[in-house]
């Protein structure tokens, strides 16, 4: 598991990382397909476009971090086009697991957070999404018990 540089950089004083999550290997299938098509069609412009798309996909995958601290849900996707998630735990209304047939077969899914005043945010293509959802719900329950 790689170090979560972005998540560490968002920590407040005395804030602790509880869990970090990695992307499922399935995200690399798109990269491989883009590379294959790009290399096969390289003599023409479309090949270059596919190779550039593959590079952008690699940078996006490498730039993705997801985690939960004792105070918030935090995440970052992308490298060039970046999207940050910073959602206070006390603002989360629901945690939804979105997993299609391929996700169930291969063990990946999307975790969607509905927050007050923030709309929907989520972790896409996470490994073992049921475990992720259960861990997040447990943290939310622990916070409710402390109130």
Model-derived regions, located:
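N-terminal basic, Ser/Thr-rich segments that initiate or prime the first beta/alpha elements at protein or domain
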Residues: 1-147
């Amino acid at each position: 598991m790689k170090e979560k540089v972005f998540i560490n950089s968002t920590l407040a004083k005395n804030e602790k990382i509880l869990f970090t999550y990695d992307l499922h290997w399935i995200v690399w299938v798109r990269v491989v397909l883009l590379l294959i098509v790009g290399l096969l069609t390289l003599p023409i412009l479309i090949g270059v476009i596919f190779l550039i798309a593959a590079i952008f996909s690699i940078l996006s995958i490498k730039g993705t971090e997801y985690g939960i601290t004792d105070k918030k849900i935090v995440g970052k996707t992308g490298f060039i086009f970046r999207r940050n998630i910073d959602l206070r735990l006390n603002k989360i209304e629901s945690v939804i697991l979105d997993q299609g047939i391929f996700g169930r077969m291969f063990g990946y899914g999307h975790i969607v957070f509905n927050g007050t005043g923030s709309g929907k945010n989520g972790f896409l293509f996470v490994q073992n999404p049921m475990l992720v959802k259960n861990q997040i719900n447990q943290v939310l329950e622990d916070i409710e018990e402390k109130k």
